[in-house]
């Protein structure tokens, strides 16, 4: 239920970094995603999370470039902060604190700022739907470490982040659906203090 280190099956062998190898429409949409993410000062939303073994949670998600916080209400009170290559979760019920490194975890790709999907990142897929856009990325030099998929609504050319999906090196799936999204609102710096 907690953001397990995200993983991937089926991404092995030599990887091509960046997205120059993709078709023009895909490159255009990737640049749109980069521009959107780099243009955010903040994003706040309610979330519903699916995790390993059908575990679920919900609460509030806050993102600013390079950091995010998740405050869980279900299944019980927990707070998680991702920043500086780390993910720290504190369970308010029992005081337990969990530390995960995001250095080689695809969730860490969301913490890069500015966001750029070239050089050491491999874009593995770009797909479009009715008023939606989805982009999947992995570490170019070691894609078997995991896959991160960002899901956007795409209404009249305006992107909004509405989902984050991932699979980790142990094949654990992580999914976060965002709703009631508010962008570029003031956020307290205390939101990103690491739980102790």
Walk through the language-model features, giving the residues of each.
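An acidic-aromatic
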Residues: 58-111, 174
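N-terminal leader/targeting segments and the immediate start of mature chains
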Residues: 14-56, 64-66, 194-196
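Extracytoplasmic
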Residues: 40-42, 56-58, 65, 75, ...
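N-terminal export leaders
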Residues: 1-3, 14
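Flexible, processing/modification-adjacent segments and terminal tails
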Residues: 31-52, 90-147
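A mature extracytoplasmic/lumenal domain signature
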Residues: 49, 72-76, 84-86, 93, ...
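Bacterial Sec-type N-terminal signal peptides, specifically the leucine/valine-rich hydrophobic h-region
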Residues: 8-11
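Gly/Pro-enriched, hydrophobic low-complexity segments
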Residues: 118-119, 128-196
């Amino acid at each position: 239920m907690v953001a397990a280190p995200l993983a991937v099956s089926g991404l092995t062998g030599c990887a091509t970094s960046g997205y120059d190898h993709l078709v023009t429409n895909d490159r255009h949409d990737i640049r749109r995603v980069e521009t959107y993410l780099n243009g955010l000062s903040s994003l706040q939303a309610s979330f519903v999370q699916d995790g390993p073994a059908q575990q679920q949670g919900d609460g509030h998600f806050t993102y600013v470039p390079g950091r995010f916080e998740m405050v869980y209400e279900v299944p019980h009170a927990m707070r998680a902060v991702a920043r500086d290559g780390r993910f720290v979760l504190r369970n308010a019920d029992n005081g337990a604190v969990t530390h995960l490194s995001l250095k080689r975890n695809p969730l860490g790709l969301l913490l890069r700022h500015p966001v750029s999907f070239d050089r050491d990142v491999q874009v593995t897929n770009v797909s479009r739907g009715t008023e939606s856009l989805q982009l999947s990325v992995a570490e170019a030099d070691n894609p078997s470490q995991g896959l991160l998929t960002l899901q956007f609504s795409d209404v009249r050319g305006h992107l909004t982040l509405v989902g984050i999906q991932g699979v980790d090196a142990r094949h654990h799936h992580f999914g976060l659906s965002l709703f009631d999204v508010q962008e570029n609102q003031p956020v307290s710096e205390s939101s990103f203090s690491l739980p102790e």
